[in-house]
Design a protein with these regions (language model features):
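Compositionally biased terminal segments of proteins
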Residues: 1-160
Length: 160
């Protein structure tokens, strides 16, 4: 599989927000395309997907942090908007941020024991593991998800 040459630029576009989330003490993990990149398969992604704990205090911290990002389109969101339903809340700013409280029917606590971390500045950014990305993407019919699954399987095989 040929990696995308723009992967480093992709990560740096999102780094400021991810560092702000980590510095704010928000309980979250990066998922989907950016997590694939963080796990070692460079490819392009245009958005950030995060899985957050739906604890009320965590959601308040998240919304406070987002109120200082971009044009503050997240200001209209309230903790009550984050229901335990499938799907994401999308915040559109410099790039799209998709916020999930469940992925594949599972909460962040389900994925927590296998979370991995990448260092950005002086903070560690949590992200989903290759095995969990495979779990979430394996039944998808999208070509990019099939490529991600193959890449994550390759990474797991290399890790032994």
């Amino acid at each position: 599989m040929k990696p995308s040459p723009d992967a480093k630029e992709t990560v740096s576009r999102f780094e400021k927000l991810l560092v702000a989330l980590a510095n704010s003490g928000i309980d979250f993990a990066v998922a989907d395309g950016l997590a694939v990149i963080f796990n070692g398969y460079p490819r392009l992604t245009l958005d950030v997907d995060i899985l957050v704990s739906d604890a009320p205090e965590n959601l308040r911290k998240l919304l406070d942090c987002l109120s200082h990002w971009g044009e503050d389109w997240a200001r209209e969101l309230k903790p009550e908007d984050f229901t335990p339903q499938p799907g994401a809340i999308r915040v559109i700013e410099e790039f799209d941020l998709d916020i999930f409280t469940r992925m594949g029917g599972k909460t962040l606590d389900y994925f927590r024991p296998r979370l991995r971390h990448i260092k950005a500045g002086h903070v560690r950014i949590p992200h989903l593991s290759p095995a969990d990305l495979i779990f979430l993407k394996q039944d998808s019919s999208r070509d990019k998800d099939k490529l991600d699954v193959a890449a994550m399987k390759e990474i797991l095989a290399r890790e032994g």
